[in-house]
Every structure is written in C-alpha cells, then in structure tokens.
Amino acid sequence: MAYFIDRRLNGKNKSAVNRQRFLRRYKSQIKQSISEAINKRSVTDVESGESVSIPIEDINEPSFHQGRGGERYRVHPGNDHFVQNDRVDRPQGGGAGGSGQGNAGKDGEGQDEFVFNISKDEYLDLLFEDLALPHLKKNQHRQLNEYKTHRAGYTANGVPANISVVRSLQNSLARRTAMTSGKRRRLAELEENLLRVENSEPAQLLEEQRLRNDIADLRARIKRVPFIDTFDLRYKNFEKRAEPSSQAVMFCLMDVSGSMDQPTKDMAKRFYILLYLFLSRTYKNVDVVYIRHHTQAKEVDEQEFFYSQETGGTIVSSALKLMDEVVKERYDPAQWNIYAAQASDGDNWADDSPLCHDILSRQILPVVRYYSYIEITRRAHQSLWREYEHLQATFDNFAIQHIREPEDIYPVFRELFKKQAEENY
C-alpha cells in the first residue's frame, strides 16, 4: 500500500500565484469595480473585503473565429429532413451577457459578469495604491515609519512564484547525500567482495548470487530516494520593514453647523474614514488632530468627531484659529510635517470668509506641507469657495475639490493624495 504525505503548510494557497497574476492583469477593471463598490458601503464598513464584478468581455482571451454573415460550407450528418445542396436557415445570433439591465427578449444567449472576492488586504492595497502624503520631508527627528518590502532570507513555506530553485536543489543534494551515504559505502564493499568472489578458485556460485542480490537491493533502495522532496523546497522570503521617514501630523477640520444636513455629514465622514485608513495603513506614528466646529471650534477625540450630535451656526475661522494655536503649542514646523483636510458645505458667515483667507495665507499655509479643502454641496459656491480659489492661485500647497454626490468621494480623495514626482523641499 502506498501512502502520500502532504507536508505543505500552505496547501490552501496553492493557486495564490495565479490569483496574484489575475489581480495584476485586470487591475484597472478591479480598481474601477472597487471605486464603484465603495460608494455603496455604509460609513462604518469601508475596511472589509469586497465582491468584485468584471464584465466577461474584459477577461475573454483573444481568439480567431468565424464572423457573422457571409457564405459558409459545412458538412452535417445526414437525416430525413435535408438532402444534399439544401439551404439551411441561419440560426438566430446570441447577444452578450451583462449586468441584467435592459429589456427581455426571446432570442440570444450570453454570460453573466465574472464575480470573485478579494480579501481585506487586497482591497485596501488597491484602494490606496499610488497615494502618498504630498511634500513629505525628512526632518530632524524621525518617528514616522513607512513600510517597504525587503528580501529576508529563505523560508520553508511560500507560494510557487517565490520558489528558490538553487537553494532547493542544494537542500535536495544534501538530503540525498545524507540518506544514501551509508548505503553507497555498503554498496562499494559488496561490489569489491563480488569482484573477489568472481576471481576466486574454485567458483563460489551461491556466495556470488547472494552478493548480486544484495547489490541489486541496495541499488533499488538508493534509487527510491526521491530527487526532490517538499522538505527540500525553499522560498524567497519577503517582509515589510518600517523605514524611518518624517514625523507628521494631520489636522481634520469638519463643519458640523446646522446647514450640514445628515447626508452631507455622512459624505464628510466617509472622506475622513478613507483618510484615516490611508494614513494608518501606509504610515506609522502619524498624529491625527480632530477639530469640529460650528460657531465655536473644539478639539475632540475620534469617537466624538464621528458620532457627536452637537451643532450650531457657522464661523469657519474658529477652526482655523484653533488649528493655529495647536500648531504653535505642540507641533514645531521645523520638526513636523503638518497637513490639514477641511470639509464643509461652504456655508459661512459672509464677513468671516475674508478672515479665513487672512488666517490661512499669513499663519497656516506658510507652515504646512499641504492643505486640502473639500466642499460638499449641490448648491452654487459661496464666498468661502471664492476666497479659497484666490489662495489656490497663490499657494502651491493648497488644493480645493468639490463633492456633489457620494460617488465623487473616492475620485476626489485620489486626486488630492496621488503620488507626485520627487520635489526638493
């Protein structure tokens, strides 16, 4: 009876290499599906995996086939309905499958979209691919770590794509040498004895036959030692190492005034949740300062920032003044990379908008690496947007974006934090 022992600890990931190849090959279609799917999630469900749909025509392999139309000559099996040279009506053409939208029809056939699941890590990797904090500078004190993949020797477990052929063959040779060295020494002794018996007088036929049987048995046992075994396999090991970069702080300023209705607040929260996930996944030890404001600004913790029901009028400058105070108290611009993301519906007391312009231009923008303003509204822009447009024309580290619908959130987020070319700062 034969026994098969599977020593692979990663047997469930035997097709991981094919999965990674598929994700690379259809990355653009997968990212498009992810950007559509994120808009359908609740505010608190941004971090789990996702079921991804790809149109079947996008993953079809190229092939040569007969086009529709034209004249064709085929040989069909004979039957009692047709004879030689009869003309056969062309069959009805089938339509392509799709998402299920459209009207019903009696003819045609097709295929549904290809649907598969991606894990949480794959989802977040694709979600934040090619994003980075703009103008990040290495300051004197380094506490912010950015994770990068490095080679880290070899491991006994891994995916087939990372197998080290040379190291595996070295292990195979060492194992076969260790397992057969005693047998080969014994084989050499038996062959020497056989040669002596064959040349002896008188002939010792029984002893000669015994030696030949022992030699054949040893050779068979040596041959049964496998050339390569799963025990020999070694895989290139990779690990993520924290590389010192610069310490950074992100200020999150959210308008919670009475003009911000619940759908608008939800869109602002979605944006900030994306920002939080991006920072926590890409960097380590990033400080985040949460500021909520209506007529008064208040520094709060994460729980209160996302779930507090407090509301009131609108004075945007109160949040900017509080941010300026916190920077002066805790975050020296010479030691910190300072970032800010402000979300509002643009509704502000008219006399306060010029004050916001002055605070930003004189106190905040000269010391921050990047300041982004997101206006969430379906209405026409008001005085705050116009003041910020003047700032954008003057300062390279100031950006403004407009969100009208939930589906605008992710494209705006990527536009604000897309990787830029290396710059000297």
Curated annotation (Swiss-Prot):
Top-level taxon: Bacteria
Feature: compositional bias, Gly residues: 92-105
InterPro entries: UPF0229
Region described as Disordered: 60-111
Bias (Basic and acidic residues): 68-90
Protein family membership: Belongs to the UPF0229 family.
Full protein name: UPF0229 protein ETA_15540
